[in-house]
Curated annotation (Swiss-Prot):
InterPro entries in the record: Ubiquitin-like_dom, Ubiquitin-like_domsf, Ubiquitin_CS, Ubiquitin_dom, Ubiquitin_ubiquitin-like
Protein name as it appears in the record: Polyubiquitin-C
Encoding gene (name): UBC
Residues of the Ubiquitin-like domain: 1-76, 77-152, 153-228, 229-304, 305-380, 381-456, 457-532, 533-608, 609-684
Propeptide span(s): 685-690
Residue numbers marked as site, Interacts with activating enzyme: 54, 72
């Protein structure tokens, strides 16, 4: 394959390599082309220096990857490191050495662990991942070494009255400790203290050294004015806690107050407002949380768990995670282990691509579950986007791009912010977290771009108690958005809300303008009664699924529950009761479906397409498939027809073995293509189609 090597002068070298080549081999090829001795070469990929004895495939370097070449300057240079005791150490270094490397050299000479070292140059603390040349540190420069620890220092705290207090502290003291010392001296309770340094409010859980507060620094003490406001915190058990807070309180402070009331450690708390997880260092006012707002408290389950990630090469990676970890966190852990950038990772579980912002528990991923890792293939395709003015934009995309990615590309070309864009394909509004392949959008497809009109309007929502709520909305808001606004005002979870307009129940994914809801329209809010009932769903294979539902659930909700259990997308489901096909927007009670009723599930075959599978005996099987079917799905269809277990099947197309997690469209398999089926024989012998 070809890879590129970019030098610091901007020159790019092309090399012919193989995945099994070592970094040493690659340096040899660079020497042949450029005459640079291997011992003067440092190769960098994905921000990581590559080691001579490892191979390109060890670092997941694929065709057309770009490595960066940094030259080791010969003879290097000397720098000096001065300690607080006045001792000066001489080090042999190179401009390309990282601060981390320098600390390791100091450890070699002086035995001081790197995590106890702080290096200062030109009054600035140096960061581990940066290089000496980043800080313009040249030969014979002097760095200052400060030990994290032990022995303390004095700082000053200045109050608004002008009084200055002197405190004995250590760099490792937390802001909380400092406030306790102020309370000892001045009698001011910590929760009434706000400490400011360099114009920044200091957070309780951070240390003085985190803020680079050194000896004889001056902090400013501001008192929190009493008065505050009340907010509510609702737990999953339905219990509501009332807290006294101020807009300037951080989320960390709020979690501490919850701990005081409920005994739940902050690191087990996740707080949600307006559907968004709140970050510790931000304040209530940053999130526009006002008096009598309701936050939702979700517990992080302790103890963590192990999950497995299987790559297409068959390698299995073990990760330590928690149910509350987001998919984004998981991708970061994979990057740490394997060096694969998150934006090149697609994670699949139960045949479904996982979205960055969701958690493992959202997908019911439990201990020892196996996720499949598919790399986003480079190469892509062109699609067209047509605006209402008739202008057509051409975009370079990949089937694995999300709608969010596509909107970002449109913003790059046209300057339209993503939140003002609505994309329509085949009459359907596309959701940000889904991919082009999810919607079967193929090369040269045309999407339609509709702008969300700014300026908004007011609508009214009338509850069964007769209370009327006023909401600020836009015609392009979805019903889901409207329910979130009602939750912010009234604290009613969206899944307990049913909205009715013109006698019709409104569906989450549709917009106000879809229902012709205009300014000053009145919607009616009906609460879903808790208590529920069981119904049965019988499939054509004879399998019966049991679902927990409520009479007020819509058919759409029921299909979503079936998807959760069986993985069948709602748009492929038709539900039949009493000989009648059920409509998405209607409720179970509309059809008089009562407890222990049985619905029948019929699958909608997609316009789809036919493909052929040829076995070694010469037999040809015809399958109904869709471009978005995974190879795993295809093997399941073959099992249904022929009884061959998927793990004994190998499928070949265009001389290439097909991987389970990839789709037919990934391999450009089109209607009436022929795949070859080879059986994996037990005992390791493989039969061949050729």
């Amino acid at each position: 394959m070809q890879i590129f090597v970019k030098t610091l002068t901007g020159k790019t070298i092309t090399l012919e390599v193989e995945p099994s080549d070592t970094i040493e081999n690659v340096k040899g090829k660079i020497q042949e082309k450029e005459g640079i001795p291997p011992d003067q070469q440092r190769l960098i990929f994905a921000g990581k220096q590559l080691e001579d004895g490892r191979t390109l495939s060890d670092y997941n370097i694929q065709k057309e990857s770009t490595l960066h070449l940094v030259l080791r300057l010969r003879g290097g240079m000397q720098i000096f490191v001065k300690t607080l005791t006045g001792k000066t150490i001489t080090l042999e270094v190179e401009p390309s050495d990282t601060i981390e490397n320098v600390k390791a050299k100091i450890q070699d000479k002086e035995g001081i662990p790197p995590d106890q070292q702080r290096l200062i140059f030109a009054g600035k603390q140096l960061e581990d991942g940066r290089t000496l040349s980043d800080y313009n540190i040249q030969k014979e420069s002097t760095l200052h070494l400060v030990l994290r620890l032990r022995g303390g220092m004095q700082i000053f705290v200045k109050t608004l009255t002008g009084k200055t207090i002197t405190l004995e502290v250590e760099p490792s003291d937390t802001i909380e400790n400092v406030k306790a010392k102020i309370q000892d001296k001045e009698g001011i309770p910590p929760d009434q203290q706000r400490l400011i340094f360099a114009g920044k409010q200091l957070e309780d859980g951070r240390t003085l050294s985190d803020y680079n507060i050194q000896k004889e620094s001056t902090l400013h003490l501001v008192l929190r004015l009493r008065g505050g406001m009340q907010i509510f915190v609702k737990t999953l058990t339905g219990k509501t806690i009332t807290l006294e807070v101020e807009p300037s309180d951080t989320i960390e402070n709020v979690k501490a107050k919850i701990q005081d009331k409920e005994g739940i450690p902050p690191d087990q708390q996740r707080l949600i407002f307006a559907g968004k997880q709140l970050e510790d260092g931000r304040t209530l006012s940053d999130y526009n949380i006002q008096k009598e707002s309701t936050l939702h408290l979700v517990l992080r389950l302790r103890g963590g768990m192990q999950i497995f990630v299987k790559t297409l090469t068959g390698k299995t990676i073990t990760l330590e995670v928690e149910p509350s970890d987001t998919i984004e966190n998981v991708k970061a852990k994979i990057q740490d282990k394997e060096g694969i950038p998150p934006d090149q990772q697609r994670l699949i579980f139960a045949g479904k691509q996982l979205e960055d912002g969701r958690t493992l528990s959202d997908y019911n991923i439990q201990k020892e579950s196996t996720l499949h890792l598919v790399l986003r293939l480079r190469g892509g395709m062109q699609i067209f986007v047509k605006t209402l003015t008739g202008k057509t934009i051409t975009l370079e995309v990949e089937p694995s791009d999300t709608i969010e990615n596509v909107k970002a590309k449109i913003q790059d070309k046209e300057g339209i912010p993503p939140d003002q864009q609505r994309l329509i394909f085949a009459g359907k509004q596309l959701e940000d977290g889904r991919t082009l392949s999810d919607y079967n959008i193929q090369k040269e497809s045309t999407l339609h771009l509709v702008l969300r009109l700014r300026g908004g309007m007011q609508i009214f929502v009338k509850t069964l108690t007769g209370k009327t709520i006023t909401l600020e909305v836009e015609p392009s808001d979805t019903i889901e958005n409207v329910k979130a606004k009602i939750q912010d005002k009234e604290g009613i979870p969206p899944d307990q809300q049913r909205l009715i307009f013109a006698g019709k129940q409104l569906e989450d994914g549709r917009t106000l303008s879809d229902y012709n809801i205009q300014k000053e329209s009145t919607l009616h809010l009906v609460l879903r009664l808790r208590g529920g009932m069981q119904i049965f769903v019988k499939t054509l294979t004879g399998k019966t699924i049991t679902l927990e539902v409520e009479p007020s659930d819509t058919i759409e909700n029921v299909k979503a529950k079936i998807q959760d259990k069986e993985g069948i997308p709602p748009d492929q489901q038709r539900l039949i009761f009493a000989g009648k096909q059920l409509e998405d927007g209607r409720t179970l009670s509309d059809y008089n479906i009562q407890k222990e009723s049985t619905l029948h599930l019929v699958l909608r075959l997609r316009g789809g397409m036919q493909i052929f599978v040829k076995t070694l005996t010469g037999k040809t099987i015809t399958l109904e498939v869709e471009p978005s079917d995974t190879i795993e799905n295809v093997k399941a269809k073959i099992q249904d027809k022929e009884g061959i277990p998927p793990d004994q099947q190998r499928l070949i197309f265009a001389g290439k073995q097909l991987e389970d997690g990839r789709t037919l469209s990934d391999y450009n398999i089109q209607k009436e293509s022929t795949l070859h089926l080879v059986l994996r024989l037990r005992g390791g012998v493989l039969s061949s189609p050729f």
